Every structure is written in C-alpha cells, then in structure tokens.
C-alpha cells in the first residue's frame, strides 16, 4: 500500500503512521499496486481535524499596597493566540496590556481572553489579584515628659510619608495618669 495526503498542512504520513499537524480538512488516498490477479485500486477518504481547545491557566496573585507594577504571566498555555486582559476593579489594580499596576487594597478579578488561531479555538479564563493593606510609616511621635500639675497641652500628630488618609485617634494606656 501507499498513502498520499493531499494537504500536508493538516497531516503527514510516514509508512502507515499518520501525524496530525494542523486543523482543517484534507483527503487521504490509499493505493494498491496491481498484481497477477488484481488491477490497481485506490480509495480516498476525508480527514477532518477540529481545532483544539487550548489550555490557558494563571495562578492567583497576592501583592501589597505600594508594590511596583508587574507582568501577569500564564502558568500554562498551549496556544499562541494573543492575550487581552481586563480587570473588574481599577481602584485595586489597573491593567495595560499584560502589566498590572497596584492602585489600592482589595481584590480584582482579571479576565484573560485568548484569540483563536489556525489550530486552536478562542478561550478565556480568570485569576484574582488580591492587594493587602500595609502598615503606615509614622515618625516624629516621641515620648513626652511632664510634671504633675502642668497644664493640658496639644499632642502633635505624627508625620507620615505615605498617602494614608486615615484619621488619627489617641488613647491613654492609663486614664488615671493622663486622659485624652
């Protein structure tokens, strides 16, 4: 027998081993040579190869507020289709291409769409980016020494070197000594 594949962009053959190389349709012809008792014979069949569903997966990401921008990278990817990213909450993370920029604490679901290619269907998946709150940096809030009977005085709020908008509150560990 001899085999012939019409479109070798779809399949190739070596002996009687057929290897699929792409999605689409082609015909395969098998031919048998004549012998003393039989004429030459051939038979053609059609081979249809469907596009595959690609594997596309991402790990969830945990960052801290103030972290630098980072690239969202696939954990597993079988297709070469282009990727587009979109986020559910830009106040937490904004997306430009595959770069994520941390904007605030919270969680955002990132949807990733992959385009169709010659051999793979389009697909989509998602991941969650969680941004943790961080402790603010406070300085210039020093111990105070006073003498009993001194008049009341104003406590100056500590200075901060961040964009924290939280309100300062004060409390005394021993209200019998000092009250606020």
Model regions: which residues?
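Solvent-exposed beta-strand/loop surfaces, strongest in extracytoplasmic domains of secreted
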Residues: 1-180
């Amino acid at each position: 027998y001899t085999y012939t594949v019409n479109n070798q962009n779809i399949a190739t053959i070596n002996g009687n081993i057929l290897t699929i190389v792409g999605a689409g349709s082609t015909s395969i012809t098998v031919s048998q040579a004549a012998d003393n008792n039989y004429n030459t014979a051939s038979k053609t069949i059609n081979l249809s190869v469907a596009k595959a569903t690609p594997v596309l997966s991402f790990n969830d990401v945990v960052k801290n507020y103030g972290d630098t921008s980072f690239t969202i990278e696939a954990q597993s990817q079988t297709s070469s289709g282009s990727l587009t990213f979109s986020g559910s909450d830009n106040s937490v993370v904004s997306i430009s291409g595959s770069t994520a920029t941390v904007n605030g604490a919270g969680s955002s679901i990132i949807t990733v769409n992959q385009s169709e290619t010659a051999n793979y269907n389009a697909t989509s998946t998602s991941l969650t980016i969680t941004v943790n709150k961080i402790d603010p940096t406070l300085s210039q809030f020093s111990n105070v020494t006073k003498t009993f009977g001194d008049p009341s005085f104003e406590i100056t709020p500590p200075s901060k070197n961040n964009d924290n908008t939280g309100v300062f509150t004060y409390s005394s560990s021993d209200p019998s000594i000092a009250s606020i």
